[in-house]
Design a protein with these regions (language model features):
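Short helix-start
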Residues: 91-134
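Short Cys/His-rich "knuckle" micro-motifs
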Residues: 11-17, 42-47
């Protein structure tokens, strides 16, 4: 049984990069959340800030896990704790350079095809403030 990473209640697996966004079914893409913290008002399915925050956390972990600029498929298999079939899916979308697969491309692919910036959170907050001013 899984426990919510926030409150400790019974939890389900949340895919940080959702499957429909191109997310992989790997441990690094999991966050264990109870129903409230998963699908509630402040959960990643209903709160864009929470969703982006979790994606930024995952992306930061990936950059820490992959400090080199290039990796072989064998290295990725071990570091990402990924199945052979998911590894094949990952590398088929990547260009193989003479040095190996590019860290930036690997991470972007695992993040659903893009890299996230902390500026996104600021833009969302500014947009929300602007919207509230225009309504009020």
């Amino acid at each position: 049984m899984y426990h919510c990473e926030i409150c400790g209640a019974k939890a389900d697996i949340h895919h940080i990069v959702h499957k429909h966004e191109g997310g992989y079914d790997i441990k690094l893409n999991y966050k264990y959340l109870c129903n409230y913290h998963h699908r509630g008002k402040i959960g990643p399915h209903n709160c864009i800030e929470t969703d982006i925050k979790y994606k930024l956390e995952m992306q930061k972990k990936l950059f820490k896990l992959l400090p080199k600029d290039y990796y072989t498929a064998k290295e990725l298999y071990g570091l990402l704790e990924i199945t052979n079939s998911l590894l094949k899916k990952l590398v088929k979308n990547l260009k193989l350079y003479k040095e190996g697969y590019s860290k930036e491309e690997i991470i972007a692919n695992l993040m659903g095809g893009k890299l996230y910036s902390y500026n996104i959170l600021q833009e969302i907050e500014l947009e929300r403030l602007y919207h509230n001013i225009n309504i009020g």
